[in-house]
Amino acid sequence: MAAERERGGRERGGRDRDERDSEFVDKLVHINRVAKVVKGGKRFGFAALVVIGDQKGRVGFGHGKAREVPEAIRKATDSAKRNLTRVPLREGRTLHHDIAGRHGAGRVYLRAAPAGTGIIAGGPMRAVFETLGIQDVVAKSVGSSNPYNMIRATFDALKHQDSPRSVANRRNIKVSVLQARRVGGDAEASAD
């Protein structure tokens, strides 16, 4: 038993997996008590919604259900790790452009923000931005306030974000030309 502890547990690659897991930050967004009606009465359980990210541009969310809260959270975390998405960030702190996303009746509007703005977002969206590594963003949710719809709408918006490289490829120009236009456009806007 002591030898197993020294090697990192019973599972293969235990120590390596712990190091991989430590790079992720997870946030519990929502926990819900659910009931299944059976012949003998009601059987209670819990559903958890977790967002996980490495604060460097990768983020995912997961949903887990179990009879006990810790088990539901563990299942949701495992599900989130399997559904990671890479999101391009501008200067490693904000979005490249303003975007909108929707899922069901939930709609979200995300705006890139200047340095020092902070995360101006409510509830589930804030958890996504914190785990993603975004430091400056302004977000607004309209319609459904259901956390599941808000998370999915946020992911829909992030999925539709274009990096400067993809925009440059689409327009057949160099990224440096595109960036120069962006900087020039900002200078013209501030001069007015």
Curated annotation (Swiss-Prot):
Residues 1-21 are annotated as: Disordered. The keyword RNA-binding applies. It comes from Afipia carboxidovorans (strain ATCC 49405 / DSM 1227 / KCTC 32145 / OM5) (Oligotropha carboxidovorans). This is Small ribosomal subunit protein uS5. Pfam families: Ribosomal_S5 (PF00333), Ribosomal_S5_C (PF03719). The keyword Secreted does not apply. Belongs to the universal ribosomal protein uS5 family. One of its GO terms (molecular function) is rRNA binding. Residues 24-87 form the S5 DRBM domain. InterPro entries: Ribosomal_Su5_D2-typ_SF, Ribosomal_uS5, Ribosomal_uS5_bac-type, Ribosomal_uS5_C, Ribosomal_uS5_N, Ribosomal_uS5_N_CS, Ribsml_uS5_D2-typ_fold_subgr. GO terms for cellular component: small ribosomal subunit. With S4 and S12 plays an important role in translational accuracy. Keywords: Ribonucleoprotein, Ribosomal protein, RNA-binding, rRNA-binding. Part of the 30S ribosomal subunit. Contacts proteins S4 and S8. Signal peptide: none annotated. Gene3D superfamilies: 3.30.160.20, 3.30.230.10. GO terms for biological process: translation. The N-terminal domain interacts with the head of the 30S subunit; the C-terminal domain interacts with the body and contacts protein S4. The interaction surface between S4 and S5 is involved in control of translational fidelity.
